[in-house]
A protein has these predicted regions:
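Residues that flank catalytic or metal-binding motifs in active/ligand-binding sites
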Residues: 83-86, 155-158, 195-199, 211-216, ...
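Acidic/histidine-rich helix-loop elements
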Residues: 89-107, 178-192, 221
């Protein structure tokens, strides 16, 4: 459900946290200008991020109109290095009450892991609505998130993207379904066990002169190889429709082994780069799905972070943090440090 809010003369279309879902077959609303999630943060974002866009345009125009008489034969200032961006992909394991490994037991461990890691972007998978609110609370006031349930609205699992509001401002975002009818809510036409989605966000980097980039976050099906391959093809097609001048970061649980699955080959064949392979420095590798069992060194990776060419990966790690033998999830989060230019 969406509500039209007017604040400071700005009209915003905002998702209502009713949990209600549109009727089956409904077409997904155009979310491209919905830049934040619910409540007061939406209004604050409108007051902060929209003027940034106008200011950037004004500053650019003012610069080009500078009097020619001011030009002097001075040396050009050296280019400043791009600030590094820390990105994590993390399958949260959906919240449940079953023991062992209930959400109540895992939540404090996840809170501590995220507080230690502090990435600026976290692409998550499997999060349920209340679980996402818990993580939002635990991350604190400097983080926000964007996401839609795969059943529409706040229903069922999400591919929510968390981000540090001190560093990043969302410009636009969108969620589509991995099916033959991507704009139809809950659509599932490739034999997947569940509807599958991609949430992408176009961010402005406040620490890098307002430069923009995309993050696309997804969770491929665990049952159908056909669905995984079709999902990879559609994801590559949608990424190709992004502004080609902007960097792209892709996060996700792909339920496919890197280097061993056609879905992986499709995405890398489209020009994307596997940050784990490209990293200048790498931590130890494990199977990223461990199922709360002993970690498997040199195991297969189903959780990846990919980028467009030209992005530098300085370091890639898998976070093995646990407390008293309790892991925060049945997956290991993967984190990379990037320079987008």
């Amino acid at each position: 459900m969406f509500t039209l809010i007017t604040h400071l003369g700005i009209r915003l279309l905002v998702a209502r946290p009713s949990g209600l879902c549109p009727p089956e077959g409904a077409v997904v609303p155009n979310q491209r200008r919905v830049t934040r999630r619910l409540g007061l943060k939406v209004l604050l974002a409108a007051a902060v991020t929209l003027p940034l866009s106008s200011a950037a345009i004004t500053a650019s125009s003012a610069s080009s109109a500078a009097p020619r008489a001011r030009r002097t034969a001075t040396l050009a200032a050296p280019a400043t290095p791009a600030p590094r961006l820390d990105v994590m992909t993390f399958n949260l394991r959906y919240a449940d009450t079953a023991e062992p490994n209930s959400w109540a037991d895992r939540r404090p461990v996840m809170r501590e892991l995220l507080h230690r890691a502090r990435p600026q972007v976290i692409g998550t998978q499997e999060g349920l609505y209340q679980q996402l609110l818990d993580i939002d609370t635990d991350l604190g006031p400097h983080y926000d998130w964007i996401g839609t349930g795969r059943e529409g609205g706040s229903r069922d699992e999400s591919t929510a993207v968390y981000y540090d509001v001190r560093r990043l401002a969302p410009v636009e975002h969108y969620t589509f379904w991995l099916s033959d009818t991507p704009e139809v809510i809950r659509s599932n036409t490739w034999g997947a066990a569940f509807p599958r989605i991609v949430t992408w966000v176009r961010f402005r980097d406040l620490a890098d002169d307002g430069r923009e980039f995309y993050v696309a976050n997804t969770h491929f099906d665990q049952r159908s190889q056909y669905a995984r391959e079709r999902s990879a093809t559609l994801l590559a097609k949608r990424i190709a429709e992004f502004d080609p001048t902007l960097p792209v970061v892709v996060t996700g649980d792909f339920n496919a082994y890197a280097h061993k699955n056609p879905a992986y080959d499709t995405l890398l064949g489209s020009g994307l780069v596997d940050t784990w392979d490209a990293a200048e420095h790498r931590g130890p590798q494990y199977a990223t799905f461990h199922g709360y069992r002993r970690l498997k060194p040199d195991g297969d990776r189903i959780d990846w972070i990919l980028t467009s060419p030209g992005v530098t990966t300085h370091r890639a790690t898998m976070d093995t943090f646990s407390m008293h033998g309790q892991f925060p999830s049945d997956h290991l989060p993967v984190q990379v440090s990037l320079s987008l230019r």
